[in-house]
Amino acid sequence: MDSEQINVNLDIGAKAVMLARRAAAAKLNNEKLPEVPDDPIFHEKHGVFTTINTYPDNQLRGCIGFPEPYYELGEGIIKSSIYAATDDPRFDPMEPDELNRVTFELSILTVPQEVTVNPEERPKAITVGKDGIIAVYNGASGLLLPQVATEYRMSAEEFLEALCEKAGLWQGCWKYKKVKISKFQAIVFGEIEPNGKVEQR
């Protein structure tokens, strides 16, 4: 399923990002969690990731999500946003006063599909800027969202190498058949500035 088949317009995207921000704010301020919007897509199961970046220097502050459609989208947004704000092991939990110095970005994912070509051909099967990728091997796993390759101007091979590192696997792990590589697409919405206008990316 391509990202174009996920029926999400900018209005829905803005609601999704707002839900993520409100969920994180509620958790950090010990308040009641926000209600999920009534729009049907929020009650369909989709994979979702919340990315929190500092503003204006755009440094990662937290990123956690669910690659598989385990949860209804609304619930997944709330959970991933709270985890990104409080439970990303790479960072200390956010403080409430940080909320006005960060932006929220939401990635709504298609169902991951295994890349079944011969391992050496995997780079050709990945479209940089469109595909996100997942590696799984022997209990270790890692995921990179599509926008990572764009942001760092990676080739498909560099993207796969970065994935191996993210998964804690060895360099060139993607060349081995026993390492499962899957790809997915995402529709991405994010704030231009804290509490600001939302754009599709």
UniProtKB/Swiss-Prot annotation:
Pfam families: AMMECR1. Signal peptide: none annotated. InterPro entries: AMMECR1 (IPR023473), AMMECR1_dom_sf (IPR036071), AMMECR1_domain (IPR002733), AMMECR1_N (IPR027485), AmmeMemoSam_A (IPR027623), Uncharacterised_MJ0810 (IPR023472). Residues 11-200 form the AMMECR1 domain. It comes from the Archaea. NCBIfam families: AmmeMemoSam_A (TIGR04335), TIGR00296 family protein (TIGR00296). PANTHER family: AMME SYNDROME CANDIDATE GENE 1 PROTEIN, AMMECR1 HOMOLOG. This is Protein TV1384. It comes from Thermoplasma volcanium (strain ATCC 51530 / DSM 4299 / JCM 9571 / NBRC 15438 / GSS1). The lineage of its organism: Archaea, Methanobacteriati, Thermoplasmatota, Thermoplasmata, Thermoplasmatales.
